[in-house]
């Protein structure tokens, strides 16, 4: 399916994970103002990479495991105004991380990822969709290990996960080199409990005074009770959706 945003166009035909509200919210929310070198893990059609390029002056490297998605991503990049700042690589994040360390290339000051989160259970009959949504090819431990090795010392990573995955993610995170620096709970409406969580990660600090405020959790509501977007949602997506 094709989607036209204010400054770019996305065709996600053949991609396991189509354009979603979750991805748009993550791409618009991630703190990118000072980023110069961004990594998009599991780029899919390239939506997050294109949003990051629109919102910053950074160079963006996108890694994607599936060859069909890589082709779609490359075409979307070539059709955008920022071709010179966008690069897509056909690779798993594990292999990319290994090669990146061996080549001693610069680390990334921001990493963005809409990760797979289903563990076990019945998978979609669509192989690409199953790969994009299930942790079989990229579990939380492997993801956090890769982010930890690719993220610059003062860098930040931005992710989004459903509520049912946060407990397991938190347990894995506790044993990693990273920690939460910001968490925003997302609700569909004021009457519904949070169903998604945006968060940023940073390297753990040994300086207690420099530790992030782990108790600070913000809240974000997508829709009013009548089904229309809230003002905060409109403000978030105003640079992307044609209607706003």
From Swiss-Prot:
Gene3D superfamilies (alphabetical): Vaccinia Virus protein VP39
InterPro entries: DNA_methylase_N6_adenine_CS (IPR002052), rRNA_Ade_Mease_Trfase_CS (IPR020596), SAM-dependent_MTases_sf (IPR029063), Small_mtfrase_dom (IPR007848), tRNA_Adenine-N(6)_MTase (IPR050210), tRNA_adenine-N6_MeTrfase (IPR022882)
Recorded GO MF terms: nucleic acid binding; rRNA (adenine-N6,N6-)-dimethyltransferase activity; tRNA (adenine-N6)-methyltransferase activity
Top-rank taxon: Bacteria
EC number: 2.1.1.223
Compartment(s) of residence: Cytoplasm
GO CC, one annotated term: cytoplasm
Sorted UniProt keywords: Cytoplasm, Methyltransferase, S-adenosyl-L-methionine, Transferase, tRNA processing
Main subcellular location of this protein, as a coarse class: cytoplasm
GO biological process: tRNA processing
Catalytic activity: adenosine(37) in tRNA1(Val) + S-adenosyl-L-methionine = N(6)-methyladenosine(37) in tRNA1(Val) + S-adenosyl-L-homocysteine + H(+)
Pfam families: MTS
Protein family according to the UniProt entry: Belongs to the methyltransferase superfamily. tRNA (adenine-N(6)-)-methyltransferase family.
Free-text function comment from the UniProt entry: Specifically methylates the adenine in position 37 of tRNA(1)(Val) (anticodon cmo5UAC).
PANTHER family (alphabetical): TRNA1(VAL) (ADENINE(37)-N6)-METHYLTRANSFERASE (PTHR47739:SF1)
HAMAP family for the chain: tRNA_methyltr_YfiC
Designated name of the protein: tRNA1(Val) (adenine(37)-N6)-methyltransferase
């Amino acid at each position: 399916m094709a989607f036209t945003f204010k400054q770019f166009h996305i065709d996600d035909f053949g991609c396991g994970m189509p354009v979603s509200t979750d991805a748009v919210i993550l791409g618009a929310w991630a703190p990118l103002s000072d980023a110069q070198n961004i990594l998009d893990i599991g780029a899919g059609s390239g939506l997050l990479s294109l949003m990051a390029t629109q919102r910053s002056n950074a160079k963006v490297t996108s890694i994607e495991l599936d060859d069909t998605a890589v082709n779609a991503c490359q075409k979307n990049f070539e059709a955008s105004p920022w071709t010179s700042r966008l690069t897509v690589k056909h690779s798993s994040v594990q292999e990319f991380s290994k090669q990146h360390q061996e080549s001693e290339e610069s680390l990334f000051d921001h990493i963005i990822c809409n990760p797979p989160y289903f563990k076990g259970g019945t998978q979609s009959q669509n192989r690409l969709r199953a790969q994009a949504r299930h942790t079989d090819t990229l579990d939380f431990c492997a993801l956090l290990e890769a982010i930890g090795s690719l993220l610059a010392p003062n860098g930040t990573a931005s992710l989004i996960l459903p509520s049912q995955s946060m407990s397991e993610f938190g347990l894995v995170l506790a044993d990693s080199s990273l920690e939460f620096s910001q968490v925003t709970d997302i609700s569909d409406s004021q009457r519904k409990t949070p169903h998604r969580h945006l968060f940023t990660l940073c390297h753990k600090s040994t300086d207690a005074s420099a530790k992030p405020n782990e108790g600070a959790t913000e809240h974000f509501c997508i829709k009013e009770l009548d089904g229309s977007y809230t003002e905060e949602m409109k403000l978030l997506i105003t640079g992307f959706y044609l209607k706003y």
